[in-house]
Amino acid sequence: MKNKLLLVSCALFLFSGTAFAENLLVTKTSGGVDEEGTLPYVVANAPGGSVIELSIGDETTVTIPETILIDKNLTIDGKGKTISVAEPGVSNYRIFKIGLYKPEDGAELISLTLKNCTLYGGDGTALVDTETTMATWSATILVGKNGTLTGENLIFEKAKNGYAAGIMACGDITLTNCIFKGLSGTSAGGALYTNSGVTGRFTGCTFENNTNTTHGGAVACSGSTNYFTDCVFTGNTVTGASSDGGAIFLQKVGASAEIVNCTFTQNSTTRYGVQ
């Protein structure tokens, strides 16, 4: 009898953990967190575990007025549409912040799966972030220390920043078939930066015509573990004096990059490590 009660209790627990997850639609192309049907509203009100889809008909772009904080496990499917700040390359806020840069001890791990969309980010050099003084970290997506990002079929364009105009990863990231093009930075990592202790996995990704004035025209890896498989690096550039790593730059103890079947063409730097 006790075993039967235990099984029933377990079943109820499992059911309760997923019962409120939903499939939700974004139906409006602009608006803030207080307006039903917008992306900020749907994310803020979605139960954990929900799948959110952009459903905007023939319209091509969803514009957000401020950074969307991801504080629960979610999947967002862009359905081939674009998610943009109000003024790409100009607006001083990110698109997504996943978890927190300084979470409390024992904070819950927050996971975002993001797929099938183009992301137009802003100008991170003027970005305001009240949670961390590292405001210049990423003009498009910041993955906090208790955050993880799984990205599939994403395109990152237009953004500029200090560190990593596309993604600043302080938590683990896994990207498949993603494209970073035309992004620019003034510190390390024109498109992407993986921070200390992070594991980054990149499969079939393309880094094209990204620039930086310090180190890592496309990617900077700082004390992180990284795996690049079937990726393409082309036309990435470091322009500053005494700068290194036209495509990938490794810094700090423990930084590593395993590179398998990747292609490097026409990347350049002013000092060491063209590729």
Model-derived features: positions:
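N-terminal, post-signal-peptide segments of secreted/periplasmic proteins
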Residues: F20-K145
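Extracellular beta-strand/beta-solenoid scaffold signature
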Residues: P65, G89-E104, A126-V143, K160-M168, ...
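Right-handed parallel beta-helix
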Residues: K79-T82, E108-G121, T148-K160, D172-S184, ...
